[in-house]
Amino acid sequence: MAHKKGVGSSRNGRESHSKRLGVKLFGGQAAIAGNIIVRQRGTQHHPGENVGIGKDHTLFALTDGVVTFRKGRQDRSFVSVLPVAEAKA
């Protein structure tokens, strides 16, 4: 029997860095073309009018306007960017 504990590697230290996911621009906020609206894993939110989707499912504004969220079929969330003139009407 060993009288001293064998020196092994630590069992801690493998927590991953946070990925900073989530909604970056909320409903009613102004968006400039190219602004990131949502960072997500998979399509929790789907692209609507004037919104593009990146290969990592990031939603971004294609035009300047106001961000809106709406529910579609089967409770699917859509994100759109409405031009300012349209949003006021």
Curated annotation (Swiss-Prot):
Domain of life per record: Bacteria
Keywords: Ribonucleoprotein, Ribosomal protein
GO biological process, one term: translation
A GO MF term: structural constituent of ribosome
Stretches assigned to coiled coil: none
Pfam families per UniProt: Ribosomal_L27
Keyword Cell membrane: no
Any one of the GO CC terms: cytosolic large ribosomal subunit
Disulphide linkage map: none
InterPro entries cross-referenced by the UniProt entry: Ribosomal_bL27 (IPR001684), Ribosomal_bL27_CS (IPR018261)
Gene3D superfamilies: 2.40.50.100
Keyword Coiled coil: no
Similarity-based family: Belongs to the bacterial ribosomal protein bL27 family.
Name the record gives this protein: Large ribosomal subunit protein bL27
